[in-house]
């Protein structure tokens, strides 16, 4: 009895050559629909599934392979006498290889203006059923869902007469991953259509983009996975030059891109260890970068710079003056790119347009915290001037700028800003006075005349008192402390204007 291979694929890459090789190795090919037609046109010896089942494809192809003569052939345990007896009684022949990839559901829902009906029609039923059946019976059946594995299977059959059990076991695991991803895409699409924000089940599936040399530290193994649907941000950056991105590179670049997205005007963001160390806006990208660099010329060394305008020659010439890990921008002038390429190891990334809201996920031991991303804009109508003195127009511009930045700094966070640039950033302290002192120390003489943004309220008036002594003229903070009155009193005493936003921006 000839061995049998069932082939039904939506992605036709390499399938004709693979089927011909199976023919040469003595396999009878069974197929359906478009795959059958393709194989027949290319002179592959192939029979229709309906010729095996004795039952035609019906309901516009919705029912093709859901038949005992198919699933019996896949699920039979070959050394079980009762199973073999059942096969003979019902005229079922074993199927040894299954090659399937599924209806293009992902490609369908990514189309513009796709209807729910179109999406539903591209939910594969028979395919996942055969994949699961073949994978479950991996001891006897080889399941293929990825063209990359075709050559391995052919070579093993040539060498051993069959695939090795360890190979079939690996391919079975891969197959269940394939159906898990597929089901996850369907589930999340339907949840979205039902407008359910936090469903009873969270089912995320990601596809591996690359293995990494190591993780956050050299002793940690790591890999990078991409969302198969949402194509934007660091996951979709095009690397134009430089060494392969590391785990920390990707993490830091992501932080830089998230902060950069806050600004519509020309902006430059420098990041180290996911915290901004220099941020600035200006009338052009060259001036924005110079201001960001001058914010902290020490910490930017070895950091990541993200820009939201095309990099010109002047900016490129400044960028190569120091060691940077990565430069990110929407594009690069040809000559500017050639200048940057002189730095052999500099990673140059082109940031693609586009953004979609998604969950913010935080892994904890044994669970997952899921929340909306902190993307609330500053509501000008809810701003409350709580001091006798109101901020000037210039101070308000800097306060808005500092408020955008402080949202992206690890708590407890303080940002000092002046003339559209950060001059001091206090990062990740366990009280509020320490990051204030850190930011003032970093700013030095630039603290005088600057404004201060705090990610959370002041439990005591000490921050205001220290800020006033340093010459800081205006403060923006959420408010809401039991001791707000003391902070307001200290601000009035020091001649500092203060605004309450009613919004907190903790970041952990």
Swiss-Prot record:
Residues 1-145 form the MGS-like domain. Belongs to the PurH family. This is Bifunctional purine biosynthesis protein PurH. It comes from the Bacteria. The IMP cyclohydrolase activity resides in the N-terminal region. GO terms for biological process: 'de novo' IMP biosynthetic process. GO terms for cellular component: cytosol. Keywords: Hydrolase, Multifunctional enzyme, Purine biosynthesis, Transferase. It catalyses: (6R)-10-formyltetrahydrofolate + 5-amino-1-(5-phospho-beta-D-ribosyl)imidazole-4-carboxamide = 5-formamido-1-(5-phospho-D-ribosyl)imidazole-4-carboxamide + (6S)-5,6,7,8-tetrahydrofolate; IMP + H2O = 5-formamido-1-(5-phospho-D-ribosyl)imidazole-4-carboxamide. GO terms for molecular function: IMP cyclohydrolase activity; phosphoribosylaminoimidazolecarboxamide formyltransferase activity. It holds the Pfam family MGS.
């Amino acid at each position: 009895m000839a061995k049998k291979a069932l082939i039904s694929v939506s992605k036709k890459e390499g399938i004709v050559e693979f089927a011909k090789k199976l023919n040469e190795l003595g396999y009878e090919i069974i197929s359906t629909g478009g795959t059958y037609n393709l194989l027949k046109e290319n002179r592959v010896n192939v029979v229709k599934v309906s010729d095996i089942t004795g039952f035609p494809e019906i309901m516009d192809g919705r029912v093709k392979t859901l038949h005992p003569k198919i699933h019996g052939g896949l699920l039979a345990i070959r050394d079980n006498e009762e199973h073999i007896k059942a096969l003979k009684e019902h005229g079922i022949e074993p199927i040894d290889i299954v090659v399937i990839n599924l209806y293009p559901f992902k490609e369908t829902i990514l189309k513009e203006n796709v209807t729910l009906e179109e999406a539903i029609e591209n939910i594969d039923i028979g395919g996942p059923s055969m994949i699961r059946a073949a994978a479950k019976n991996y001891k006897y059946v080889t399941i293929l869902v990825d063209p990359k594995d075709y050559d391995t299977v052919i070579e093993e059959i040539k060498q051993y007469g069959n695939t090795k059990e360890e190979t079939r076991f690996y391919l079975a695991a891969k197959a269940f991953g394939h159906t898990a991803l597929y089901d996850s895409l369907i589930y999340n699409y339907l949840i979205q259509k039902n407008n359910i924000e936090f469903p009873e089940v969270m089912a995320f599936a990601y596809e591996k983009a690359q293995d990494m040399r190591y993780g956050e530290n050299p002793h940690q193994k790591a890999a990078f996975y991409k969302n198969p649907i949402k194509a934007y941000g660091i996951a979709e950056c095009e690397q134009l030059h430089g060494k392969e991105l590391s785990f920390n590179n990707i993490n830091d670049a992501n932080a830089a891109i998230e902060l950069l997205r806050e600004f519509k005007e020309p902006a430059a963001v420098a990041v180290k260890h996911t915290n901004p160390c220099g941020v600035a806006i200006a009338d052009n990208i060259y001036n924005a970068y110079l201001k960001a660099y001058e914010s902290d010329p020490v910490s930017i060394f070895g950091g990541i710079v993200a820009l939201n305008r095309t990099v010109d020659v002047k900016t490129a010439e400044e960028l190569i003056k120091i060691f940077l890990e990565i430069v990110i921008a929407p594009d690069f002038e040809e000559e500017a790119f050639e200048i940057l390429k002189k730095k052999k190891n500099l990673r140059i990334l082109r940031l693609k347009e586009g953004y979609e809201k998604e969950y913010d996920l935080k892994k904890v031991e044994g669970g997952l915290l899921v929340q909306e991303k902190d993307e609330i804009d500053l509501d000008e109508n809810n701003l409350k001037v709580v001091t006798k003195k109101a901020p000037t127009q210039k101070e308000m511009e800097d306060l808005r700028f500092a408020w955008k930045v402080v949202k992206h700094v690890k708590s407890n966070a303080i940002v000092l800003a002046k003339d559209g640039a950060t001059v001091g950033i206090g990062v990740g302290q366990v009280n509020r006075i320490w990051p204030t002192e850190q930011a003032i120390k970093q700013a030095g003489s630039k603290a005088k005349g600057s404004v201060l943004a705090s990610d959370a309220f002041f439990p005591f008036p000490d921050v205001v008192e220290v800020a006033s002594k340093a010459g800081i003229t205006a403060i923006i903070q959420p408010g809401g402390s039991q001791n707000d009155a003391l902070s307001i009193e200290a601000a009035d005493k020091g001649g500092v204007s203060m605004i309450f936003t009613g919004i907190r921006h903790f970041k952990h």
